[in-house]
Amino acid sequence: GTRAHNRWRVHQTVSVVCPKEANAEALKILNAGVDSLGFCIASEAFTAADLDTLLGEICIPAVQLTFCGQKTADVAELVLAKIEKEGIAKEDVRIAFCIDPLVKGLSTKGDFCSPNGEKCFARIAELIRKTKEYKHIRVVTVSGQIFGNSGSTIVEELAFVLSAGHDYLVRLMDAGLTIEEAARKLRFSFSVSSNYFMEIAKFRAARMLWANIVKGYNPEKNCACKMQIHAETSKWNQTVYDPYVNMLRGTTEAMSAALGGVYSLEVTPFDASFENPTEFSKRIARNVELLLKHESHFDQVVDPAGGSYYIENLTQSIAAEAWKLFLEIEEKGGYTEAYKAGFIAERIKASAAAKDKNIATRRQILLGANQYPNFTEVAGKEITAESVTRKQAEGNVLVPYRGAMAFEEMRLHVDRSGKEPKAFMLTCGNLGMARARSQFSCNFFACAGIKVIDN
C-alpha cells in the first residue's frame, strides 16, 4: 500500500438525548484522547438549533464525526447546511453518516422504508451529489457488525458485507452516479471477535476483495477502490457474569483490528451488555486503544502481518471462501433478493445454532460463563432478566444476541430464587483421576450457580 503508518482513529459514541449534555460529554472525551466522535440521535425531532448546541465548541476540522440513530438523512442535511454556513473548507470535513437501508433497514426490520427502497436510494443519491466536493464525507455505512453480533461466522460476515456494498453500488449507479461517486461515499463497519488471527486476516481480505469488486467497473482512479473500515469490538461474546473479563476480550479484539489496518475503532465498554456504560468503563475502553497506540506503538508499523506465512495463508483462505459465498449471493440476484428469499437470515441462524451448541457442550469456551466461573459471584441488581434473555426473531430478520445468554439465564434464575442449591462431591477411587473429575464437576455445577461441597 501507500500508507506510511498504521494510525487509526479512536472512536467513541455519545447518545444524544439532551444535546447540551451530549455536547459536554463529547468535549470531555475529546480531551481524553478520542479523535473520532459518534453521535447517536435519539429524537426524530432533531433540529438545527439542537445541532448547534451539540457541536458547540467542537472544532469540526480537528475531529472525525459520525452520525447515526433517528432520521440520519435529515440530520445529514442539517450538518451540510451548518458546514456551508460556517464556511469550513471542504477538504477539512471528515464526517460519516450511518444511512443503511439494506442492512439496518431490510435485515433488522424486514423491509425498506418504501417499496423496494426506491425513496431511500433516491435520497442517498441526492446526498451523494450534494457532498460530491467533500472528499472525506461518507454517506452510507454498511453495518456489518449486525451479522457478527447475530451469530454469523467470519466468512459470512465478510461475504454479506461485500454483497450489501455491491448492491449499493449497483443501485446508486442505476440512480445516475458513476462508480467513483458511489464507491467513495461508502463506509464499512465490522465487528471484531476474539478469534485473533482470523480477524486480522478478515480485514486484510476485505480490502482485497472490495478492490476487486470496484475494479470490475473500471473506475478512472484507483482511489475509488479503497475501503474505509470502521470496527467495533464484539458484543456477541460479552458476558454479564465475571464482566471484567470483557476488558481482556476487548483488548485482544482491538489488537486484531489495529493490526488489520482499520480506519477507526470503537472498543465496547465491558459493562455494555447489562447497563448503561459507566464513566469508568468508557474510560477503560478508550485507554485500551490509547495504550496500543502510545505504549505498544501499533500505529507505527504498516501491515505488520505482511509476510507472515500463517496470516497470509489465512487471508487467502478467508478471501476464497468469502468470494465463493459472495458469488452465490450474486447468483440469487444480489443482497436484496437473497435476503428477501431468506437465504442470508437462515444461513446466519444456522451458524448461530452451531455456535450455541458448541458453547453448550463447551467446545467453544466463554470464560466466566461456561468455563472457569467465579464461584462466589452473585448477580448484582443491575443484571436483569431482560439482559440475559434472548429475543426471538419474528420473520425474516436478524436479532443480535450474546452467546452466553443460555448459561446466564439459568444462573440468574438460581441467584434470584433466594435459595442456594448445593451439590456434594463424593469422590472415590484413584486420587489423581478423582481430582480431575472433581475439578470438572465443580466447574460444571458452578456455571449454573450451584455451590459445590467438596469432601
Locate predicted features:
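Intrinsic disorder at enzyme termini
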Residues: 1, 263, 321-423
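Mobile "lid/hinge" segments at catalytic clefts and subdomain interfaces of large enzymes
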Residues: 132-171, 251-326
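Conserved, mostly hydrophobic/aromatic
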Residues: 33, 87, 210, 260, ...
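Short glycine/threonine-rich loop-to-helix capping motif typified by GTGT followed
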Residues: 152-158, 193-205, 234-247, 275-285, ...
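A glycine-rich phosphate-binding loop feature that marks nucleotide/adenosyl-phosphate handling sites
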Residues: 98-102, 142-149, 182-193, 224-236, ...
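Glycine-rich anion/phosphate-binding loop at the beta-strand->alpha-helix junction
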Residues: 189-285
